[in-house]
Design a protein with these regions (language model features):
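Nucleic-acid-binding surface
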Residues: 1-134
Length: 134
């Protein structure tokens, strides 16, 4: 986080942080602005995804991990991102994230999910899955 200040933890890494997946992250998934250079950090396997605005800046939370402030996407934004990048991470991961979000969140915010789906332009993709879990 200190070496890459514009990066935001996303996808599988964010799902794992929020407890929304059974997947074990083997890399740290980072969102960077379009056309940013790929950072190199020794000993840390990174997987970079390029985001454009407004998707990059939407839904960011700041959490403290080991005394360091880390930018990470909210659970709702992460679920929408999983559907956007379903061809890279797998549709099964996206569906599992949505189902787990609904089951483990005391008050699921489906309006926020719909907002982030619209920002990511995946409303049509997510709609049948949202209807199935409601």
């Amino acid at each position: 986080a200190i070496r890459i200040p514009r990066a935001v933890v996303c996808l599988i890494s964010a799902l794992a942080h929020h407890g929304l997946t059974t997947q074990v992250p083997h890399t740290v998934d980072l969102a960077l602005p379009s056309h940013a250079q790929i950072p190199k950090i020794d000993g840390v396997p990174l997987r970079v995804f390029w985001y454009s605005e407004p998707s990059l800046s939407a839904g960011i939370e700041v959490v403290t991990i080991d005394g360091v402030s880390v930018r990470i996407y909210s659970p709702e934004k992460t679920v929408a991102d999983c559907f956007k990048y379903r061809n890279k991470i797998g549709l099964d991961v996206a569906i599992e994230a949505l189902r787990t979000y609904r089951e483990r969140t005391p008050k699921p915010n489906f309006q926020a999910l719909a907002k982030f789906a619209q920002i990511n332009r995946v409303q049509r993709v997510m709609r049948p899955y949202l209807e199935a879990v409601l």
